[in-house]
A protein has these predicted regions:
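Flexible, polar/acidic helix-loop-strand segments at domain edges
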Residues: 171-248
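Extended, hydrophobic/aromatic-rich amphipathic alpha-helical segments that build helical scaffolds
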Residues: 1-11, 27-45, 55-92, 119, ...
Length: 359
């Protein structure tokens, strides 16, 4: 994330001594450090393809393979595409991973560490004591609170209230086919729920308080589901038990399809792409073009932190991230926006040795 956000950052792999200033590497230099480190780890041949249930959350070979493919593809390093494809196909050939039959089950509590899950960050509400004064202690996550509607009537539609941030765009909801189960598993139409309830029970007049950029739609994948923080012992809004899904098997398939389409090697890109496409109930096969693969990634991974980086690495950011009709986005993305500006306090702390990004 530091590499993706800031690109040109200080790097050190040994403890620093006074004055504690590390050499600033370029984004390309840092990439080489990361990718060769991963290659060294893989060559050790000590990681299991998947951990047993008592060790879920530990690094596995499949997780390292996915991280390797992610950074190689983000860097557009075609010299390593064939290696990344080999790693994806090792996961695909493993009996330890597969697609969940029903997409709607993936983000339920019962879907945590399913056969589709390659890596998750564990969160728990059981005796969780994370609080405002101790945010780094083990416990739950605050994400459901952040993204659920503000002053929502708790328990309605089995959802609880949050702070109303990060609503889902209506255009995202409408991008899905009506029979695509990913639509409702991703986009919760909260306003429609209240409208239907109030039509049946007009005296209730249920509502929630709208916040900035409200659309009536919220991210269902990590929503504040009633009861998912019932066993916490501290601040309920900070201790939800929703695990954060980092890598899923569907991404392995789409990575493989894309790498083959980009010329990384032989393989059935169409098969891999349509395994994901058809799992969503879409019976008409699609061709493995880069545009189709990136669109399938869009539909598959809304809210999972993939889309923005896909737009950058595929050169689509400048044409997609443009001023919107609502007045929220007023500037177009440009290549100078790829990296954030380095905070001035960090430049000061580095005794002026850091070169600022051209933001």
């Amino acid at each position: 994330w530091v590499w993706k956000f800031w690109g040109n950052v200080p790097y050190f792999d040994k403890n620093l001594t006074a004055p504690y200033v590390a050499e600033q590497l370029t984004a390309d230099q840092l990439y080489e450090k990361m990718v060769t480190s991963l290659e060294e780890v893989i060559q050790l041949n000590v990681l299991p393809m998947r951990e047993d249930s008592e060790n879920y959350g530990r690094v596995t070979l499949a997780m390292v393979y996915m991280l390797y493919a992610e950074i190689v593809m983000y860097q557009n390093d075609d010299s390593r595409y064939s290696t990344a494809l080999k790693y994806m196909e090792e996961i695909i050939s493993s009996p330890q991973y597969d697609l969940m039959p029903d997409y709607t089950d993936i983000f339920k509590e019962t879907g945590e560490w399913s056969i589709e899950s390659i890596f998750e960050i564990n969160y728990k509400d059981d005796n969780a004591v994370r609080d405002w004064g101790s945010p780094l202690v083990a416990g739950g996550t605050a994400l459901p609170t952040l993204i659920s509607p503000y002053i929502w009537p708790n328990g309605t539609d089995n959802h609880d209230r949050g702070w109303g941030f990060c609503p889902v765009r209506k255009e995202t909801y409408e991008r899905y086919s009506n029979n695509d189960p990913r639509r409702n598993a991703t986009c919760w139409n909260a306003q429609a729920v209240l409208d239907a309830h109030n039509a049946e029970h007009p005296g209730d007049k249920l509502s929630y308080t709208t916040r900035y950029q409200d659309t009536g739609f919220f991210l269902e994948k990590y929503a504040a589901i009633t009861g998912n923080n019932k066993d916490q012992k501290s601040s309920s809004e900070l201790n939800w038990n929703n695990n954060l899904r980092i890598y899923r098997y569907s991404e392995t398939l789409l990575n493989a399809a894309e790498l083959i389409t980009r010329g990384a090697g032989q393989g059935d890109a169409k098969k891999y792409l349509n395994l994901v496409h058809k799992r969503a109930g879409l019976v008409t096969e699609i061709e493995p073009t880069l545009d189709n693969i990136i669109e399938e990634r869009h539909l598959e991974f809304v809210g999972e932190g993939k889309r923005y980086w896909d737009l950058i690495r595929t050169g689509k950011a400048a044409s997609v991230l443009v001023p919107d009709a609502y007045g929220y986005r007023t500037n177009s993305w440009s290549s100078s926006k790829k990296y954030l500006p380095i905070p001035q306090k960090e430049i000061d702390a580095a005794k002026g040795t850091l070169v600022q990004n051209n933001y």
